[in-house]
Amino acid sequence: MTAKEIRDSFKSFFESKGHQIVPSAPMVIKDDPTLMFTNAGMNQFKDIILGNHPAKYKRVADSQKCLRVSGKHNDLEEVGHDTYHHTMFEMLGNWSFGDYFKKEAIGWAWEYLVDVLKIDPKDLYATVFEGSPEEGLERDNEAASYWEQFLPKDHILNGNKHDNFWEMGDTGPCGPCSEIHIDSRSEEEKAQIPGNQLVNKDHPQVIEIWNLVFMQFNRKADGSLEGLPAKVIDTGMGFERLVRTLQGKTSNYDTDVFQPILKAIAEMAGTTYGQDNQKDIAMRVIADHIRTIAFSITDGQLPSNAKAGYVIRRILRRAVRYGYTFLGQKQAFMYKLLPVLIENMGEAYPELNAQKTLIEKVIKEEEESFLRTLETGIRLLDKTMNDAKAAGKKEISGVDAFTLYDTFGFPLDLTELILRENGMTVNEEEFNAEMQKQKERARNAAAVETGDWITIKEGDTHFVGYDFTEYETSILRYRQIKQKNQTLYQIVLSDTPFYAESGGQVGDTGVIVSEFETIEIIDTKKENNLPIHITKKLPEHLDVPMMACVDTEKRAACAANHSCTHLLDEALRQVLGTHVEQKGSLVTPESLRFDFSHFQKVTDEQLREVEHLVNAKIRENIPLTEYRNLPIEKAKELGAIALFGEKYGDEVRVVQFGNSIEFCGGTHVPATGKIGMVRIISESSVAAGVRRIEAITGAKVEELMDTVQDTLNDLKALFNNAPDLKVAIRKYIDENAGLKKQVEEFMKEKGAALKARLVENAKEINGVKVVKAIIPMSADVVKDIAFQLKGEIPANLFVVIGSVDNNKPMLTVMISEDLVKAGQNAGKLVREAAKLIQGGGGGQPHFATAGGKNPDGLNAAVDKVIELAAL
């Protein structure tokens, strides 16, 4: 079976068992503060599992694209070194929300593997939770009894809490699980060692392929367990491992999931996969990482230096580094693999082809940028090695190696490889200590203590913010969080007009008011689609009616800026072309930011045209047309624009202002006239193929215009209220340029005369012409004089000049090449003498400069240079 046939067979099987087949959620997560990426199939169902929302379907199945770069078996630096771990992978899964449980989950897993896929039963093993006395948990005898209907007892193994008790996090739903393992060894190997001795022993041919999680508990903040009201089945099967098993391969990379990409890489590198272990590792790294990078960009995450973007950049750079080091790829190459990836996976994930141009451009620019950084890093490593050799050492410090890692993306193994080639080593203990310090810093910065939810009353949350900014409500539950030595409280309300941060729009602020007190809401966030109201103070009376009141001034400003982004999007399409797609946005009360796909700088003329179009739509005062709970197919028929990387349900909200029609959950003005006016204040590049416009609206435009007018008035006053300010400024610039030229010519004449005087006054010491002086000249003039002197006296010349410019002392030393060969070094001399002017400096052996703070020490510094030179 091909990979496509296997994926389709899984969906068909569970569809026949009454499961709703749902599309994969985006790999990039936007509304869960605990995760950056989808790392399991259950992520998109977290709200249901946590009880925040009811399940639309009781039974669900899908194939989910996932990304893991940490955790059990997922150290990024190990990917590529074995044949079955990946960063990006597909997870086949089926779920039950309060419907079937262990019996059906185990029975259907067996039916699919054995009856549909025809896997030999004697090669299968199942693990069950052995229990935990300290938790008061018994062995999962229920699961074991169901497995005994299919497997002999020696194929049913007990597993410890680490392997067979699944937990969502430190708190939340959890429960025992059953792993299904398959033994793919030869019959001879099986005869020598039984498979049950190799389960969970990291044997490359005895691997886990499916995990059946039976969620039946909730882990509280104090570590105790309580039963879940509705039990959940959550299963996940590694697609790549399953394909490998069914295609009879010993490596995931030998399957049709990876082979087309590996062949393309080998062709680029002029090699063959399977002939050289180090090259094979490099090719596996690249084949794995190109999938991760392409899907991440498709789902809206560009490489960057922060958070999720940094993870993607790190993965991309790791792949480039392997290509550079082991496959001779000194130019950008990964972007050329995209057509092969699309041909291989584009049918299952059409968004890849839809975003092809953007993905290629982003990857290519990132590669080229890192290759430049790599060259810089190599030069720095060369200098570090030379300094160590000069000091008689064969080891560089771990601190230097960590700087290379942290600043230039040099993993330790690349540094070690280059050092080995030069007969040197690195202090790994120091490097590891620096790495540990960085991890501690990151851990402390991100540390959050989250308490249990305290329930005041049962119920669901209803958002009423599209229609109301004040609404009567009550507190359903709350919890305490501690972060960065600050205690905050998160509150869930029964009904809320507060918009929770999402879709680029910041969350509402305001107050909740009862007859006893007023509590300030400092922010509103969304956690798995649940609005969370954040406050510094918990109400003393939690079970009384309250009024939730949004800050209407901030809300109105946000609404104006959000509606403006829609008009801006439409105008950009008109001016630049239909290739323009939104790639991100930020809507605050103060301003708006809009990122979009475009492959060159937007000209000033184009920006002006866009701004005029938007302002024309504002003046038209186009009323808002809003569609709520619209079936997604109907929304598409309307022509509504959806964003790549966003997850939409079966029903959506659509916002329309004339020709601008978009899927959107944000708050908007009732008519475009409420925006007032827009002014674009900047346009810049975010990444390859992605531009950014920043703009302001309404009162902020008035403030800007006032500032501009004030500046204009000040300029007019400076030019005596000249009738034509532009002409007056041009005349001033021209006159200034003329005067500057006169000064330069005067300084040249003065410098020439000074140079002649210096040559005349030069002293000869032991055959060396020594030019020593202190002059009131700028650093540039002194430098010119020094090089002119060298031109006139090419041998046996030693120049030391002290100068003062704007009360800042400067020391300049120039030495002829023959004296340098004899052992003189201007850089070393300057560094030592600069201490006398309270400064520092350096340079090359033949020319160096130093600046300082103490002009009074200049004479002593000049004499010190002569003394140190020992002429």
Swiss-Prot record:
Alphabetic keyword roster: Aminoacyl-tRNA synthetase, ATP-binding, Cytoplasm, Ligase, Metal-binding, Nucleotide-binding, Protein biosynthesis, RNA-binding, tRNA-binding, Zinc
Cofactor binding note: Binds 1 zinc ion per subunit.
GO molecular function, one term: tRNA binding
Annotated Zn(2+) binding sites: 562, 566, 664, 668
SMART domains per record: tRNA_SAD
Catalytic activity: tRNA(Ala) + L-alanine + ATP = L-alanyl-tRNA(Ala) + AMP + diphosphate
Compartment(s) of residence: Cytoplasm
Domain of life: Bacteria
Its EC number(s): 6.1.1.7
Protein task: Catalyzes the attachment of alanine to tRNA(Ala) in a two-step reaction: alanine is first activated by ATP to form Ala-AMP and then transferred to the acceptor end of tRNA(Ala). Also edits incorrectly charged Ser-tRNA(Ala) and Gly-tRNA(Ala) via its editing domain.
UniProt xrefs under PANTHER family: ALANINE--TRNA LIGASE, CYTOPLASMIC (PTHR11777:SF9), ALANYL-TRNA SYNTHETASE (PTHR11777)
UniProt note: domains: Consists of three domains; the N-terminal catalytic domain, the editing domain and the C-terminal C-Ala domain. The editing domain removes incorrectly charged amino acids, while the C-Ala domain, along with tRNA(Ala), serves as a bridge to cooperatively bring together the editing and aminoacylation centers thus stimulating deacylation of misacylated tRNAs.
Family: Belongs to the class-II aminoacyl-tRNA synthetase family.
Protein known as: Alanine--tRNA ligase
UniProt organism field: Phocaeicola vulgatus (strain ATCC 8482 / DSM 1447 / JCM 5826 / CCUG 4940 / NBRC 14291 / NCTC 11154)
